[in-house]
């Protein structure tokens, strides 16, 4: 998985050429047949997506996901509200376009030749490869050559089906697979780690995020090279929606919004550590419930889950932790820092978390106003680890190397250079363990992703349990003693009701 390199000159040229080609489709008033004009008249942009941390998910009634945030901003760009329909698999998404139930698909879908024969692709914004996955401890396949339909199961509409058909025709004549018409890719990955399936195929970003919550999932091999991800809409002679997408993406490229969102959702790195992730998740189950109230109490301006991730990186949630250099406690504070914060006992969990959060808040307050709000925390954490002055040096070095000193994606790449003499010798504040600060922030982000994913999945399971309980009302003891009917009470099947139940119920403000 990697972010696509952006060539701004090429974007400008392509924009001009497409703008000229799409000029007749731009939504001028007085053209009600125009697709964008219809969306504006209706007052809502209808998208279909799938449920995943990368595309769209909810926790505590708050929505998140790269495709969700982009689609929400695109709806704002059009001046309409966003209506979201969540489907179980990719085939259902394209059915929504065919049936006119969606204006576009925003679901991390890969661009390929088969899809663009029937649908209009939008701009691409990152890329993925398709990966064959299996469960840790089971036999790892080294090739696709001998896989059977009993071993390999794929979600309906998955882009890998086209690739497998090509491989079967050209290289692996014995290759076979089965399509599960009822389950999506996430459900199939779950079935793999549950031992119910041998293998499935998923994109590299989905696999990476799934591993943060289920480290038992392992990658056997890549079956494709990097493929661009894009939005899709219906293909016809009206290109107004494509023109609007192009202009929108050009705008967020130029103002840095796309880069910030990519860093937020794709910038957590690929160096997955099975043992470290499993250790963290076990602590989430066994230790976190005891200290979670403290994180919730003292988090203040940041999410408590992020504060918990910081504390895990510092001490593994051990209030008695002590380092060889003398820092102690849950947040590993120095004696001088603790005294400056008015703390009397660094090994008291409440005092340590409160003090560490106040110290971090001081760092956040120092971060220049030019830093975007959603990235200030990363600059502050780097400063928390290596000192604020060295953070200023990293920003200055980024500027000197023609990078963006206000972009965490650019600045973090310069952090390791602060420990290299050719660079630190020319900086105002000199040597710093910048490589440690880089690893410090990246580790915290990974732990946060694991924690958010774990809690989101737990919340979803609880909701499913409650929904199931509502379908099976309690029976009073005296009713158990009544004679049973000799015939079963059949009810009329309503297809529309079944489809309503299959859809995820979302917060009202999204409709």
From Swiss-Prot:
Primary localization class, coarse = membrane
Signal peptide (UniProt feature, chain positions) = 1-19
Q: Which UniProt keywords apply?
A: Cell outer membrane, Cell wall biogenesis/degradation, Lyase, Membrane, Signal
Catalytic reactions of this protein: Exolytic cleavage of the (1->4)-beta-glycosidic linkage between N-acetylmuramic acid (MurNAc) and N-acetylglucosamine (GlcNAc) residues in peptidoglycan, from either the reducing or the non-reducing ends of the peptidoglycan chains, with concomitant formation of a 1,6-anhydrobond in the MurNAc residue
* Chain residue ranges for the region called Non-LT domain: 20-269
HAMAP family for the chain: MltF (MF_02016)
Name assigned to this protein:
Membrane-bound lytic murein transglycosylase F
Q: What organism does the UniProt record list as the source?
A: Klebsiella pneumoniae subsp. pneumoniae (strain ATCC 700721 / MGH 78578)
Gene that codes for this? mltF
């Amino acid at each position: 998985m990697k972010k696509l390199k952006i060539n701004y000159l090429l974007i400008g040229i392509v924009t001009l050429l497409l703008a000229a080609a799409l000029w007749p489709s731009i939504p001028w008033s007085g053209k009600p047949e125009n697709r964008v004009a219809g969306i504006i008249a209706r007052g809502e942009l209808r998208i279909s997506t799938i449920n995943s941390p990368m595309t769209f998910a909810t926790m505590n009634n708050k929505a998140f996901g790269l495709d969700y945030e982009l689609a929400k901003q695109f709806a704002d760009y059009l001046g309409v509200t966003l209506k979201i329909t969540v489907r179980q698999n990719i085939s259902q998404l394209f059915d929504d376009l065919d049936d006119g139930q969606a204006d576009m698909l925003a679901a991390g879908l890969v661009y390929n030749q088969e899809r663009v024969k029937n649908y209009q692709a939008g701009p691409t914004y990152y890329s993925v490869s398709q990966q064959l996955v299996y469960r840790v401890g089971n036999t790892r396949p080294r090739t696709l050559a001998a896989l059977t339909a009993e071993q390999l199961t794929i979600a309906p509409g998955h882009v890998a089906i086209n690739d497998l058909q090509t491989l079967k025709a050209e290289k692996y004549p014995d290759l076979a697979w089965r399509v599960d018409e009822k389950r999506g890719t996430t459900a199939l990955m779950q079935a793999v780690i549950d031992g119910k399936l041998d293998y499935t195929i998923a994109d590299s970003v989905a696999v990476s995020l799934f591993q943060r919550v289920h480290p038992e999932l392992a990658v056997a091999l890549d079956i494709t090279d990097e493929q661009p991800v894009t939005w899709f809409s219906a293909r016809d002679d009206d290109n107004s929606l494509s023109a609007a997408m192009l202009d929108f993406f050009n705008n967020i490229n130029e103002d840095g919004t796309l880069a910030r969102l990519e860093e937020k959702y794709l910038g957590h790195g690929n160096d997955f550590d099975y043992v470290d992730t499993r250790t963290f998740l076990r602590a989430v189950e066994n230790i976190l419930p005891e200290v979670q109230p403290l994180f919730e109490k003292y988090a203040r301006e940041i999410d408590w889950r992020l504060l918990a991730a910081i504390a895990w990186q510092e001490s593994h949630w051990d209030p008695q932790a002590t380092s060889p250099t003398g820092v102690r406690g849950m947040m590993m504070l120095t004696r001088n820092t603790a005294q400056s914060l008015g703390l009397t006992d660094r090994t008291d969990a409440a005092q340590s978390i409160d003090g560490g959060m106040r110290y971090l808040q001081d760092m956040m307050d120092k971060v220049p106003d030019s830093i975007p709000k959603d990235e200030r925390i990363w600059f502050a954490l780097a400063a928390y680890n290596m000192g604020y002055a060295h953070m200023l040096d990293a920003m200055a070095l980024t500027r000197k190397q023609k990078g963006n000193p206000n972009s965490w994606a650019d600045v973090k790449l310069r952090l390791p250079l602060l420990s290299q003499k050719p660079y630190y010798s020319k900086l105002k504040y000199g040597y710093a363990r910048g490589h440690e600060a880089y690893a410090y922030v990246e580790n915290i982000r990974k732990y946060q992703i694991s924690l958010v994913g774990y809690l989101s999945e737990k919340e979803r399971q609880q909701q499913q349990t409650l929904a199931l309980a509502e379908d099976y009302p309690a029976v009073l003891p005296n009713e158990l003693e009544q004679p049973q009917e000799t015939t079963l009470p059949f009810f009329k099947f309503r297809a529309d009701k079944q489809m309503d139940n299959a859809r995820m119920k979302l917060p009202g403000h999204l409709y």
